[in-house]
């Protein structure tokens, strides 16, 4: 009988992992975990339904990490300050909580699902007040910070200034009528201009006793009719020649406070240039800048002195023409400049240092621009003390000898 020994099953020895293998397994598990989180991140975000306050179709807004960004809400609904929804238990509107920073809308306790949200917008009066305060602050900042570069910047102030100038030139103004006969009545004065167009306002200025002052004002119904009046070189009203002009531009001032002048000095002229040529050249040039601008007056001094003055109805057109520097009239290049008004303070001929009394009045009287006064008496010659000779002079007359010192025969001064 054979010796039977029990067979013992031998299990294979456990595999011993090296440290390198353990590191590889840890990295593999980390990669799997990262892949799962990436898959969660790439899933579509949750959307909430927001009703447009204007009654349009609702809009779905995305959420980021369970919150709605205020920038997303305001980009979709300008002026929005928050969200609200209807509480089914109480029937009242419940506002969505805003975080302290004011940048996020926190989800309700039961989440964003199954709810329709409505936009909360500030009242219009508060928005207007906020916008006006912001505009006032920015305007104050511009006023403080832009004093130096306001002339060089062609910003909003420059555009508004040009807009006001265009609006002023596009509306009829009160035209001044000079040289009106003192016997002309208001009816005759108005009838003359009604033959040209529709008169809105017409008046002859009178004194307190009712007598005419010799001038008046008229306003036409449109700029076109006003230009018709200004285009007539001579107006004969009640048998008398009258001048019709736009009121003096010195009453209008630019933003620096300087007067706006519409009178142009034209130099380098020859006697071959006449008034008609100046009117045509400057009228066409003015209309190229301001459509309603016309030449209101041309003055050529007599006797001819080589220059003239051209007055336009628009100061802006005059400035633009002068900025060119020169124009060609009858084949001749003429010089241009703004005709500055003569200041009253600069009419004296100069200081009167060291002059005797009475010479100042004499110089004022002899000024070429001074009007003579009728029956004016001539000024008396001032008393001027004759020059004194302080050198020794022999005095031999008996009258002078009495002033000598007693006993001195050589005369005074010895």
Swiss-Prot record:
GO molecular function terms attached to this record: chromatin binding; RNA binding; single-stranded RNA binding
GO CC annotation terms, alphabetical: chromatin; cytoplasm; nucleoplasm; nucleus
Disruption phenotype: Increased lifespan, slower growth rate, reduced egg-laying and reduced fertility. Defective locomotion and chemotaxis. Increased sensitivity to osmotic and oxidative stress. Increased intronic A-to-I RNA editing and splicing abnormalities, which may contribute to the increased accumulation of double-stranded RNA observed in the nucleus of multiple tissues including gut, muscle and the anterior head region.
Top-rank taxon, per record: Eukaryota
Major location (coarse): nucleus
Induction section of the entry: By hyperosmotic, oxidative and endoplasmic reticulum stress (at protein level).
GO BP, sorted A to Z: determination of adult lifespan; hyperosmotic response; mRNA processing; positive regulation of gene expression; regulation of gene expression; response to oxidative stress; RNA splicing
Gene3D superfamilies: 3.30.70.330
Chain segments carrying region Disordered: 1-58, 132-167, 343-414
PROSITE patterns according to UniProt: RRM (PS50102)
Compartment list: Nucleus; Cytoplasm
Tissue: Widely expressed in a range of tissues including body wall muscles, pharynx and neurons of the midbody in adults and larvae.
Cited InterPro entries: Nucleotide-bd_a/b_plait_sf (IPR012677), RBD_domain_sf (IPR035979), RRM_dom (IPR000504), TDP-43_N (IPR041105)
Occurrences of domain RRM (ranges): 173-259, 262-341
Biased segments, Basic and acidic residues type: 1-44, 153-167, 361-373
Keywords from the UniProt entry: Cytoplasm, mRNA processing, mRNA splicing, Nucleus, Repeat, Stress response, Transcription, Transcription regulation
Primary role: RNA-binding protein which regulates transcription, splicing and RNA-editing. Limits the accumulation of double-stranded RNA by maintaining the abundance of the mature RNA transcripts that are formed from double-stranded precursor RNAs. Stress response protein that acts downstream of daf-16 in the insulin/IGF pathway to regulate longevity and the cellular stress response to osmotic, oxidative, proteotoxic and endoplasmic reticulum stress. Involved in the regulation of physiological processes including aging, fertility, growth and locomotion.
PANTHER family recorded: RNA-BINDING (RRM/RBD/RNP MOTIFS) FAMILY PROTEIN (PTHR48033), TAR DNA-BINDING PROTEIN 43 (PTHR48033:SF9)
Oligomer and partners: Interacts with chromobox protein homolog hpl-2; interaction may maintain localization of hpl-2 to gene bodies.
Protein's name according to its UniProt entry: Tar DNA-binding protein homolog 1
